[in-house]
Every structure is written in structure tokens, then in C-alpha cells.
Amino acid sequence: MKLGNLVKDHWIDGDGDGTVLTSAVSGSPVASITSKGLDFADMLQHARTVGGSNLRRYTFHERALMLKALAQCLMEHKVELYELSTQTGATRQDSWIDIDGGISTLFVFSSKGRREMPNSHVYLDGPPEALSRTGTFVGQHICTPKLGVAIHINAFNFPCWGMLEKLAPALLAGVPAIVKPASSTAYLTELMVRRILASGILPKGALQLICGSVGDLFDHLDCQDTVAFTGSKATAEFLQQHPRVIAESVAFTAETDSLNSSILGPDAVPGTPEFELFVKEVTREMTSKAGQKCTAIRRIIAPASLASELVSALSESLGKVRIGNPAMKDVDMGALASQGQREEVGDRVKLLSREADIV
């Protein structure tokens, strides 16, 4: 199966055979992916002229209700999304974070849009400001939708939630989106987008999808566009230095290379609730999504006096984790998202083992 690209409200296959995507569990082919031959400039123009115009016709409340309807629609397709999610190496609990978590984000933004935003096309940013003594000169800040496109470049670890957490605020703001999922798990994103398009809830041009390379997309950005990137620091810096991004002052936000830590206090000795909680949470974060969450604990800091006992407790806790096919109910941790991720983790373990012992 070749993944489709959603271009100007139609599914388009990229040219050529594309790159084969394999199951994280079995290694068997799941789909092929390519975006060769797409007219990225035309996609941007369609989003600006058709998608943006259509979205701006609605009020904040009306767009918020779209998000609610979209969430309700996706709830009806959870079974097939969960089934396909296992191919990414995700257990049912992992998929719950990704799929149900993403859908919940739609509900949250829908609720906030109706509670915190006006039922109008303009958002007033604060009260009027008197700029003269007599009150004849008054200023008022307002917020209106940008006239560009929201470019969303997403990571491999959350193919559903990663898309929906960015898509929800963009649509609520009245800005169309072009989504580029990470290739290794793009087949799950593509399925969700297919269900979104089929629902007919979003107006034409509001959402487009690129499965594969973004090609020369960045060459056609302008000052009204925004880029939201999730991935490595190196890639983010490379994209931020694109001549067009600099020349047009394109708004660019990036979430990169999370290095979250958990610190054990010197008074949290073995036998205390704090010590047990520390071990429990470190184990959870090391095994949830096979340790691939952006919020995973990657640095464990503890007093030297407690290090030996902590290592023993963590070894015992991790030894109970059942690793295997995530489709099996008795499995606690599935596979890494791709063979490439497996190789990278292996390389990093070898690097760390030069200075540290493998527990």
C-alpha cells in the first residue's frame, strides 16, 4: 500500500515506488511512502486562498464546535486506529496516550475556545487604551487569523497526538494546516487524516498532508506562514536557517531533544514512599512507548550514597517488565518505532558503555 498525500482536498500518490515502511514488530512491509512530484507551492497557495478564506468565515465558537465534532468522529474510528498502532510498536496503553490523548486535545481546545474566546471573528486583547487626555484618541489591540499556513512537521513517537495537538489550535485560530508526519509511523497519521477528510467536518483547504519529503516547500513560505517543528535540535536549526525563513521572518517554533531528569533527594532512602515512587516513575518512563516519549526521564540523578540501592531497585523493577508483541495483552513494552531507531539506540548504548556500566 502506498500512502497518499492529501493535496488540495484530493488524495494523490507520489511518483515512483517510494520508501518501504516496515512493521516495528515483525519487520514486514506496512506501506511505501513518497511525495515526489507534488507541487508544494500550489499546496501553499490552496491553503492560503481556499483553506484560510473558508476558515475565517466562521467565528471562534463555530471553529471550536468543528473541533468537538472532529473529536467525536475520531472516537468512532478508534478500533482501527488502535489496530494499526500496534505496527508502530505501541502497546494498548501506549496507543491510549497517542490516540485517546490526541482526541482529548481536540475536546480541550474546543471547550477553551467556547469558554475563553468570543463568538465572533475578532478577539479583543485587553480593554481600550486612552491615548489622549480628552479620550478622543483611543487604541484597541485585536487578534485576527493570520493569512498564511501553519506548517506542522511532527515526530515519529506520537503520530496521532503529535498532529492533533498542533492542528487543534491552528484550526481554532482560523489558520489552515499542512501536516508532515515523520515517515516511519506516517501510516497511522495518514489513516487518521483519511477519516478526518471523509467526515466532511472541515472546510475545503483547511488540512493537507505530505507523506514523505517536504521538497521545496520552504522555498515558498512568506511572512504570514508559521512553522511548528518537533524533532531533533540539529534538524530544527537547519530549517531555521533556511534563507526563506530568515528573509520572510517566518514564525518558527521547535520542540527538540528533551532531556528530562528525575532527582532523588538524600532523605528519600529505601523504604520511604518517595523512594518507591521514584523507582515506579523511572520504570514507567523508561518503558512507556519503549522510552520514546518526549517527557521520558532520561537522566536519573541520585546521591552517591543511595546509588547502589537505587540501581538494585530499578533492576528488580525493570526485570518484571514483559517485552514482546504489543498486540498481546500480557506485554508491558513493545518495540521501538523502527529499525532505524533500534540501530540508533544500540549505537548510543555502545557510546555510553565507554563511561558507564550496563545494568
Indicate residue ranges for each PLM-predicted region:
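N-terminal Rossmann-like NAD(P)+-binding subdomain of aldehyde/semialdehyde dehydrogenases
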Residues: 1-135, 320, 337, 345-346, ...
